[in-house]
């Protein structure tokens, strides 16, 4: 594993005043597919303003956990609470409107729409549901919010371009902008730097650090250097369970974690 960054580069979780209670909490979260237990009694808390990373070998349960939290999969047992409210088993659209947004491992945009339209539709769905046939200019501040989301991810100058014309790195950042437009409490990023060049990865790392000033972020990522440089805390999944949890420096020196990674 790479050397952890200094505390100066950490997210501002500790500076958000008294609001440090958990935004997300899972209690005994379990999911089974036939005889396979993909998640086994996961108890996890993510504090407000925190950047939490989930790492682990392939098949460890990382994506399954993401899919449970965002409503793609319904858990077999256990609970998921967002800001103390039970959202267990709710469909993705309701979970999104409750305050959880996500990006996907595979780029998920509307390629034949403009960059602004991609983000505007997301902002509109958060405020008014999927009322696509109403003229969007009747939605007051929707465009303003969409433009603010584009500015946050560095794409304001490309608002009128087709999304298909963006580079791969820009398309991944557009996905983050789409998520931001829904005004989430918790932003879930599923391998946000997958397929990126080193320069694009660095740009995305800086972007995540910027937007973390106002958000709680949950990230699944295989790039250990990126994880160690961004995360406040890391949860290590293995065989559907949490093997270890702690700040980056602690995880880097954890003998059980090192053993798992050396075996893979």
PLM ranges: what are they?
Residues 2-264:
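Glycine-rich phosphate-binding loops of nucleotide-dependent enzymes
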């Amino acid at each position: 594993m790479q050397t952890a960054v200094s505390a100066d580069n950490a997210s501002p979780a500790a500076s958000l005043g008294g609001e440090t209670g958990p935004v997300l909490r899972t209690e005994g979260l379990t999911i089974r597919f036939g005889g396979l237990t993909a998640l086994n009694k996961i108890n996890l808390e993510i504090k407000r303003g925190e950047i939490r990373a989930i790492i682990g070998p392939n098949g460890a349960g990382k994506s399954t956990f993401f899919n449970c939290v965002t409503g793609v999969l319904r858990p077999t047992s256990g609970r998921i609470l967002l800001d103390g409210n039970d959202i267990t088993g709710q469909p993705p659209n309701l979970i999104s409107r409750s305050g959880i947004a996500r990006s996907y491992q595979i780029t998920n945009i509307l390629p034949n729409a403009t960059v602004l339209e991609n983000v505007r539709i997301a902002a509109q769905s958060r405020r008014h549901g999927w009322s696509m046939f109403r003229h969007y200019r009747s939605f007051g501040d929707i465009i303003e919010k969409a433009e603010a989301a584009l500015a946050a991810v560095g794409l304001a100058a490309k608002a009128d371009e087709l999304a298909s014309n963006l580079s791969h790195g820009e398309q991944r950042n557009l996905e983050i902008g789409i998520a931001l437009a829904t005004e989430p409490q918790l932003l879930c990023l599923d391998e946000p730097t997958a397929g990126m060049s080193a320069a694009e990865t660095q740009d995305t790392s800086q972007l995540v650090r910027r937007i973390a000033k106002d958000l709680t972020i949950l990230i699944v990522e295989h790039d250990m250097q990126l994880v160690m440089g961004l995360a406040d805390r890391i949860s290590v999944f293995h065989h559907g369970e949490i093997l270890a949890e702690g700040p980056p420096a602690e995880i880097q020196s954890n003998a059980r974690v090192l053993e798992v990674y050396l075996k893979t």
